[in-house]
């Protein structure tokens, strides 16, 4: 997490401006198909990328399946998918399994920035939460050492009654990120209503006056309210791009795409060209459109060099 914040501080002046993002040029038409299996968080963005990509390459077909980031590494290892979108970086054990099979690591691309959001029903009057309080709401362990278990909104001075928890299942990279950063590796409470996707978490909280949940910002709707977060009581920050980049908002993260690229070999034309499109102005505009944040222009050349 510290590494991500330091990196973002170095590039914050470049990401805000679209200058440096090059228009996509389809110099050679490509045909063929590929499969993408992985992150639910990236599911909609993958579909939007494909929709525009097909305007340049009409015969290309890419199947997209978003059942959680943990489904991506096995799919890439077994070659049931050529594109593996993930809302977290691969774990060491996942990288080890890939290398055991192929003798080299998978290639990682950082395709977007996200702010993981904690949200409540739109009528909840809450003004903000510390990470300690969020941990005490969601975790049975309270590794951040908050003074008490928060199972009732009255404990935060909000007259709503029992807290109703919504979250993702363990196949989700968002689940893993939240567990690692907010809960400091602690365990979720057993009464969290686990949902199959981020949209379901948002839907559940939107109709539950006592609800609280989490997801990437791309799934946020007007039916719920994002809770500003902070490390200290009274110092809360929203999910603005500026706050993510300067590290004040504590839950910023990269979104990733992994591929199987043997050293000194080229990817299939469909996969390579699709990745080139993602890092173009058109591709990164779709990131904006889907509610996320584009990657810094300063890193795009380095990401594209991984294709060589």
Question: Whereabouts are the PLM-identified features?
Answer:
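Flexible loop/hinge segments at secondary-structure junctions
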Residues: 18-308
């Amino acid at each position: 997490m510290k590494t991500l914040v330091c990196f973002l501080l170095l590039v914050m002046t470049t990401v805000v401006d679209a200058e440096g993002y090059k228009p996509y040029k389809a110099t050679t038409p490509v045909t063929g198909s590929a499969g993408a299996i992985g992150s639910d968080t990236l599911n909609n963005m993958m579909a939007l990328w494909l929709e525009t990509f097909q305007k340049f390459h009409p015969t290309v077909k890419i199947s997209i399946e978003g059942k959680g980031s943990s489904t991506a590494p096995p799919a890439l290892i077994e070659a049931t998918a050529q594109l593996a979108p993930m809302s977290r970086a691969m774990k060491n054990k996942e990288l080890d399994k890939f290398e055991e099979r192929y003798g080299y690591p998978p290639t990682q691309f950082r395709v977007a920035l996200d702010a993981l959001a904690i949200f409540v029903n739109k009528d909840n009057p809450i003004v903000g939460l510390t990470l300690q309080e969020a941990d005490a709401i969601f975790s049975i362990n309270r590794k951040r050492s908050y003074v008490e278990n928060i199972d009732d909104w009255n404990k935060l001075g909000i007259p709503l009654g029992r807290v109703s928890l919504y979250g993702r299942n363990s196949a989700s990279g968002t689940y893993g990120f939240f567990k690692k950063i907010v809960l400091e590796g602690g365990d979720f409470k057993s009464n969290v209503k686990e949902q199959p996707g981020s949209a379901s978490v948002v839907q559940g909280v939107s109709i539950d006056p006592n609800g609280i949940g989490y997801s990437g910002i791309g799934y946020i709707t007007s039916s719920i309210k994002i809770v500003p977060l902070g490390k200290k009581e009274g110092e809360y920050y929203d999910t603005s791009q500026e706050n993510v980049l300067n590290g004040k908002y504590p839950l910023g993260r990269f979104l990733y795409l992994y591929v199987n690229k043997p050293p000194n070999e080229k990817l299939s034309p469909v996969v390579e060209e699709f990745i080139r499109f993602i890092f173009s102005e058109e591709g990164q505009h779709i990131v904006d459109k889907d509610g996320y944040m584009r990657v810094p222009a300063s890193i795009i050349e380095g990401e594209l060099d991984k294709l060589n």
